Each structure stands twice: as structure tokens, then as C-alpha cells.
Amino acid sequence: VSNQNPEQIARDAIDAQLRDAGWVVQNKDSINFHDGQGQAVREYPTDTGPADYMLFVDAKPVGVAEAKRETLGHNITTVEEQTAEYATARPKWIQSNGKPLPFLYETTGVLTRFTDLRDPKPRSREVFSFHRPQTLREWLAGCRSLRDRLRDLPPLDPQGLRQCQVEAITQLEASLRSAKPRALIQMATGSGKTFTAITSI
């Protein structure tokens, strides 16, 4: 293992993470869509070049994973554009519906970022691991993305809440609807922060 270059070391780690998440890692020369719930095919050819990993569920491409060496780490977001190109590329040997693949990953084998193109305002976020093939299948079966569902939160019932709590929860919900990545609730001591936090969940 010590004679491997950084790219090979990263690929070994990525292969292991994909397997841990339930993907069957395969080479492009020996694809078997009947092996396992989902297949991660290395160097799958597209009309813009080979994708590091093309993810298949039910013999259909559903996503891509762009692999980079670990030293890229904190700068991994710089390859998001490359991943997006593969998502819109036409895969070889299979019929394509012309739509971009919805699930995009960039990974070093240590750090993994994920973008769900079904989101109203797609943007990448760090995830602990690859999603399981079954999870992607469920999402594709009609389940809206979390960020999309957050746009349709039910109205708040203000009964039993103080005005400052109503304002805090209303502003938090507005932030969630806008797909903002962070929100801060600042309330005075004794104003019911704990109750507000529980109510907002």
C-alpha cells in the first residue's frame, strides 16, 4: 500500500466507503446491473469523458461521484462544476432521458460533499457517508427533497406562545423556506428559548 500514489489511496478509501453504504463497486469493463441494490461503476464513459464513479440504481444512472486526492480536502468544492458536467453528460451504452442526474458527490475518501439537484436551490453540503442505493431509490420514487418540503411548512399555531416565541419561530421558518444554510435565534434570558426550540421542531 505504501507504493500507491495519493489518487490510488483516495480511490481505495472511496471504494470502501461505497461498499459500506451498500454499493457494489465495479469496473466499466465488467458491469453487472443484477449484482446488488446499486452499482458504482468506475470510470464510466460519457460524452464529456469518464466519470470517476457513475451510480446506478435499477440499471439506471442516478448520480455521479467525483474522486479527488485527500490533499484537495478543504478545496473540494472547486470540483463541483466538473461533477455537474458529468451529471448533464450523456452516458454511453444506455438510454438517457436527457435530464441531469440528481445526486452528485465530491469526495476525497475522507471528506464527502453531496448535492441534491432536486432541491429548489441546489448546493453542496458535507455528509458523513454516501447514501445507500435504497435511499436514492426511495427519493426518486416521488419523495420530495427535505429542502423542497421545508418550503411547505404548515402554519404555526401561536396558541400558548409568547409574542417573542412566535416571532422567533416564524423567522426560523422563513429562513428554512429560503433554503438558508444557517439560522440563529437570539432571545433574552427567561423568554422561553427551550420551549421555542422544541416547538420549532
Give the location of each predicted region.
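ATP-dependent helicase/translocase motor core
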Residues: V1-I201
